[in-house]
């Protein structure tokens, strides 16, 4: 049985099959990162597929939750590495903090990036940017309720619809915060 048939076997109606196919293509495209490229507009581009499924209540959109299962192993592996890196960082930081005057001779340990593959749709504009940047421009927002996305985008600290448009075109993403003089960017999303 091919992967398409395996994915489609969860669907029980034509609507659910459409939702599963669109969701699977989007998730698989996101998981390809920069391993697959094609020429577009004079540049080599990797897949950046975006799906937003709109249909009446109880019409079968909920089956999209199964799509998340396709990419959870990727997310879980990344998160496990982050846990291990944070553990190592805390150990190094504790040793660094006890060095006393010797600290000036050694570079302070750096907190590891909070990498993830599955990015929460319930997020701020800067949060989305940080998640994408920490993952080197790759990630997937997979929410089963449109309200989660629309509420976050429309909130006071949301407004990340421009980030989605920039990511689609693989444009540079950046932000600057005066408070800590923090500037971050990813040259290609």
Kindly label every feature range from the protein language model.
Residues 4-189:
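Phosphate-handling catalytic cores of nucleic-acid transaction enzymes
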